[in-house]
Amino acid sequence: MTLKEYKSGQAFPGVIGRTFDVSKPACPAPNRAREGAPNVLFIILDDTGFGHLGCYGSPIKTPNLDALAADGLRYNNMHTTALCSPSRSCFMTGRNHHSNGMSCITEGSTGYPGGNGNIPFENGMISEILLQNGYNTYALGKWHLTPAEQTLSLIHI
């Protein structure tokens, strides 16, 4: 039973003990990542290649990224469209950019199949998979996955 299903006047389905630690709420415990599950951090950078990060042998000093890479996974075989929106949509869904409706950057959405700038709901995103497995998710920074006509532009105010 969830809290939304619990109605006043019904028998309380939980347990109210003398202390919190021996009490049980009416709703089930939230899904949690398994014990020892790794932390997951994705960093997506535009206009960056192997020659820009120290962890790939670059002379450019990137100590914080190098430290993260030393304790995590580093990808060295990848595909890019050389455009941010299509590449980001591939990364976020694990699908080809045309199946995501991202044949180009969202400002260039064509309205044709594979180029409407809208990721289909059924394609899902990695954040949804993580949530289903008890992870908390957070996105920060440039999104650039919405067609221009669906965003607020200061030019039109």
Question: Can you describe what each PLM-predicted range is?
Answer:
Residues M1-I155:
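Formylglycine-dependent sulfatase
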